[in-house]
From Swiss-Prot:
Keyword Metal-binding: yes
InterPro entries recorded: Ribosomal_eL37/eL43 (IPR011331), Ribosomal_eL43 (IPR002674), Ribosomal_protein_eL43 (IPR050522), Ribosomal_zn-bd (IPR011332)
Function: Binds to the 23S rRNA.
The protein's name in its UniProt record: Large ribosomal subunit protein eL43
Cofactor(s) needed: Zn(2+)
């Protein structure tokens, strides 16, 4: 059975293991289900751009961190 690499498996053996692990942590946080700080709904928050987050349920838009909304 092969090793499970997750989202960073597309890089193969390139870029070094440390950078791939750091990138994997950041991307898993980015695509995780986030909670809206206004309506407290989970799973409806999307990233529009770097640092700009939007809730599909209450239509609120706010500035957060680059890869996480708060």
């Amino acid at each position: 059975m092969g090793k499970v690499t997750g989202i960073s498996g597309r890089f193969g053996a390139r870029y070094g293991s440390t950078l791939r692990k750091k990138w994997k942590e950041i991307m898993e946080k980015r695509y995780d289900e986030h909670q809206c700080p206004y309506c407290k709904t989970t799973g409806k928050v999307i990233r529009l751009a770097s640092g700009i987050w939007y809730c599909k349920k209450c239509n609120s838009k706010w500035a957060g961190l680059a890869y996480t909304p708060y």
